[in-house]
UniProtKB/Swiss-Prot annotation:
Keywords: Cytoplasm, Initiation factor, Protein biosynthesis. It comes from the Eukaryota. Residues 14-166 form the MPN domain. This is Eukaryotic translation initiation factor 3 subunit H. GO terms for cellular component: eukaryotic 43S preinitiation complex; eukaryotic 48S preinitiation complex; eukaryotic translation initiation factor 3 complex. InterPro entries: eIF3h (IPR027524), eIF3h_C (IPR045810), JAMM/MPN+_dom (IPR000555), JAMM_MPN+_peptidase_M67A (IPR050242), MPN (IPR037518). The lineage of its organism: Eukaryota, Fungi, Dikarya, Ascomycota, Pezizomycotina. The keyword Cytoplasm applies. Component of the eukaryotic translation initiation factor 3 (eIF-3) complex. Component of the eukaryotic translation initiation factor 3 (eIF-3) complex, which is involved in protein synthesis of a specialized repertoire of mRNAs and, together with other initiation factors, stimulates binding of mRNA and methionyl-tRNAi to the 40S ribosome. The eIF-3 complex specifically targets and initiates translation of a subset of mRNAs involved in cell proliferation. One of its GO terms (molecular function) is translation initiation factor activity. It comes from Sclerotinia sclerotiorum (strain ATCC 18683 / 1980 / Ss-1). GO terms for biological process: formation of cytoplasmic translation initiation complex; translational initiation.
Length: 367
């Protein structure tokens, strides 16, 4: 009864142990810029997914001596598909079996992956999460650790699940315009983000509380006269902090803008492909309409002659309507554009003031 009640409560948050966070950060940083993936284990407690341990998936090593420029991309593609490969499924089962032997939570609750500059919304992420989440009431999440963002001093760790509407559409495999309009599925409905809580053990929390809060202070010996101050000149004079006036734009923002432009270009490519399909469909439908009109006139003429009418469904054999391309790639790209836009919006607060300051100095008559 307890398990049934727990599954009926939807997931509303993810609690990650601090040790697991350190393991994920270390594993992702060790393989950067190649994608790193791994499995996470834990348990579900009243809608809170508690992640208590993790281990990385083994990846294929690429020789650095005779490496090819495409070897990095090949290694990243292999690592991105690692969570659903047969070899890693067996490896994950063996690891969970060994964790059970040492009395560790051995329930698989998802997987983790690394990201670079917020670029993680792709087909591999969807396929991996669908592989874990496809079972009914499967309580799994995907943890995404952005290595480049975390290198700036703030941990970037996010938890995602596929939305129920997207899961239904992905099972059917029909991402056509008609089906998307019926289900009202948009790029915003692909992923559902859950808040993450970093949890420490009671032993570690007690240790942190017992540590001295303030360092012992000792009295400073102030100079008694001007001669003492002149004689003991500080080796490093105090300079004003001018870093806030630096006009150079954050390289992370520049790179994010470049990737945003690439995603927008990809979006227009997908849009042009869909427009080409619509033009082809319109031409074929016009041919079918003309053929049906001609056949209807022939049948009317044959009816006056008391002859058997000709079949009116032969157009299906004579004409082949083009198949609508899947809109999944376009949806994922639109979601990635939204992700980049949010990142740019978070960086423009400190940059906008500098840009207006430069404009007022260069163009004082317009200020």
């Amino acid at each position: 009864m307890a398990d049934t009640t727990s599954k009926e409560v939807p997931l509303h948050s993810v609690q990650v142990e601090a040790l697991v966070v350190m393991k994920i950060v270390k594993a992702c940083a060790a393989t950067y810029p190649t994608t790193a993936t791994g499995s996470i284990v834990g348990m579900d407690s009243n809608g809170t997914l508690q992640i208590t341990n993790s281990f990385p998936f083994p990846t294929a090593d690429v020789a650095a001596s005779d490496s090819h420029p495409n070897d990095h991309m090949a290694a990243s593609n292999i690592a991105a598909a690692a969570p659903r490969s047969k070899a890693n499924i067996v490896y994950q089962s063996e690891m969970i079996k060994m964790l059970k032997e040492v009395n560790v939570d051995a329930n698989n609750v998802g997987w983790y992956t690394s990201a670079n500059m917020g670029n993680f919304i792709n087909t591999s992420l969807i396929e991996n999460q669908f592989f874990y989440q496809k079972e009914p009431n499967e309580r799994t999440v995907a943890l995404v650790h952005d290595v480049s963002r975390s290198a700036q001093g703030a941990l970037s760790l996010r938890a995602f699940r596929l939305s129920p509407n997207f899961m239904t559409a992905y099972k059917e495999g029909k991402f056509t315009t008609e089906n998307m309009q019926k289900s009202k599925l948009t790029y915003k409905d692909i992923l559902v983000e859950l808040p993450i809580i970093v949890h420490n053990s009671h032993l570690l929390t007690s240790f942190l509380h017992q540590m001295p809060v303030e360092l012992p202070k000792k009295e400073l010996d102030f100079p008694a006269s001007l001669a003492d101050l002149t004689r003991n000149t500080p080796p490093t004079p105090l300079y004003p902090n001018l870093e806030s006036l630096d006009l150079s734009i954050d390289p992370y923002l520049e790179r994010t803008c470049d990737m945003l432009l690439d995603s927008i270009e990809t979006h227009y490519t997908e849009l042009n492909n869909f427009q080409y399909f619509q033009r082809q469909l319109t031409r074929e439908q016009a041919k079918v309409t003309a053929w049906k009109t001609k056949r209807a006139a022939e049948n009317a003429s044959r009816a006056t002659q008391k002859l058997a009418p000709l079949p009116e469904d032969e157009w299906e054999r004579l004409f082949k309507l083009p198949t609508e391309p899947s809109r999944l790639e376009g949806m994922l790209n639109a979601r990635q554009v939204d992700q980049y836009s949010r990142q740019v919006d978070g960086f423009t607060a400190s940059i906008t003031g500098k840009m207006f300051a430069v404009k007022s100095n260069l163009l004082p008559e317009q200020s």
